[in-house]
Amino acid sequence: MTQQIGVIGLAVMGKNLAWNIESHGYSVSVFNRSSEKTDLMVEESKGKNIHPTYSLEEFVNSLEKPRKILLMVQAGKATDATIDSLLPLLDDGDILIDGGNTNYQDTIRRNKALAQSAINFIGMGVSGGEIGALTGPSLMPGGQEEAYNKVADILDAIAAKAKDGASCVTYIGPNGAGHYVKMVHNGIEYADMQLIAESYAMMKELLGMSHEDIAQTFKDWNAGELESYLIEITGDIFMKLDENKEALVEKILDTAGQKGTGKWTSINALELGIPLTIITESVFARFISSIKEERVNASKELNGPKASFDGDKKDFLEKIRKALYMSKICSYAQGFAQMRKASEDNEWNLKLGDLAMIWREGCIIRAQFLQKIKDAYDNNPGLQNLLLDPYFKNIVTEYQDALRDVVATGVQNGVPTPGFSSSINYYDSYRAADLPANLIQAQRDYFGAHTYERKDKEGVFHTQWIEE
């Protein structure tokens, strides 16, 4: 008897996705390069419709045609090697789905290569971590739409469900569109986390709040417009005590790790010429956190103000909340502008409002305000920037003074706020009809004869700036 779908790669994500698929009534073949993981899967899957295989030949032959194969192997060379090993065993029309943490450019390359062999290829972003993989992730599949339609029922079944019952999956676009959108999702995630961390720093360093009060603050915030998974878990984190009944989070080494997708997002923004300042500052913040020894030494050598606050703490805490929400809006405005530009350049025809909808559940950045983004693009599909939508425009107009005060107070007290600072600088730059770039153009023309345009007349000009 043949199985309906196969999964290659039985690390935690692959294993949990296989179980998720099986739980929705599908029969699943599984294969792993090391047989030990396959044996463990068998042991853990008793009573489930999971079919183990111990060679690629056995695996491929166990699947009904056209074969549907989900690859959950390490991104990069391992994925290429697995595809190369599979190709001689596959038939025209079979479908490969790469669900790994893959660079979208690799997906574009593989899509082109496999098109020559009549093998359908889907590059699919998977968000939600190991729990989401098991209970329902947010899925971002890109590739041939015809191939997507053949696996849509399975993906629809296993995806997270929003409160209105909609599945958090949609066809994203051709070739690398799915993995691209997942990359930007991860970049936005970096910014969300950094902005929350800066809010915590203000509460701790400036307001002197206890971990119990910080936990309650995040729980309160989660009941309002900031409602989101990351705000929710932040409240939980501050309630967790260690073996000495002290806040565990305060014992964790302050060096933030990363897998590189935030960096990919920033590099791509540079290539596109898109100002992605908040996400990029969040990447840099992780970099500077990683040089712990240097920072400890510098703290003994470099002077600065000692944090102190003698104002109304309740009032300032509300300003932090407003600063966080406005900065979050600015970050998403940048991320969606980046996806808009990439869609134009690659002819992906991304439906930006739909992307917000599939992020409502299952993924790390799930949040109440994503519905507002969907509404913005429904009202104006050609919207250039989220800040120009009436809802978001009203919020940032009302909240900007709070953000300015938080940033200024942080600077005056030596509390670093790279994300908040970048947000207000982006806002002010974006709303500026005139920027001092005219001087930069004059400098470029002075030393390099790069020429310039003028406001008052047509044409391209070069000036001899000093008399010989």
Swiss-Prot record:
The keyword Oxidoreductase applies. The gene is gnd. NCBIfam families: gnd, PRK09287.1. It is an enzyme of class 1 (oxidoreductase). Substrate binds at N101, S127, G128, G129, H185, N186, Y190, K259, R286, R444, H450. Its EC number is 1.1.1.44. This is 6-phosphogluconate dehydrogenase, decarboxylating. It holds the Pfam family 6PGD. GO terms for molecular function: NADP binding; phosphogluconate dehydrogenase (decarboxylating) activity. SMART domains: 6PGD. One of its GO terms (biological process) is organic acid catabolic process. Keywords: Gluconate utilization, NADP, Oxidoreductase, Pentose shunt. NADP(+) binds at G9, L10, A11, V12, M13, G14, N32, R33, S34, V73, Q74, A75, N101. Pathway: Carbohydrate degradation; pentose phosphate pathway; D-ribulose 5-phosphate from D-glucose 6-phosphate (oxidative stage): step 3/3. SUPFAM superfamilies: 6-phosphogluconate dehydrogenase C-terminal domain-like (SSF48179), NAD(P)-binding Rossmann-fold domains (SSF51735). It catalyses: 6-phospho-D-gluconate + NADP(+) = D-ribulose 5-phosphate + CO2 + NADPH. Belongs to the 6-phosphogluconate dehydrogenase family. The active site is at K182, E189. Homodimer. Catalyzes the oxidative decarboxylation of 6-phosphogluconate to ribulose 5-phosphate and CO(2), with concomitant reduction of NADP to NADPH. InterPro entries: 6-PGluconate_DH-like_C_sf (IPR008927), 6PGD_dom2 (IPR013328), 6PGDH_C (IPR006114), 6PGDH_Gnd/GntZ (IPR006113), 6PGDH_NADP-bd (IPR006115), 6PGdom_BS (IPR006184), NAD(P)-bd_dom_sf (IPR036291), Pgluconate_DH (IPR006183).
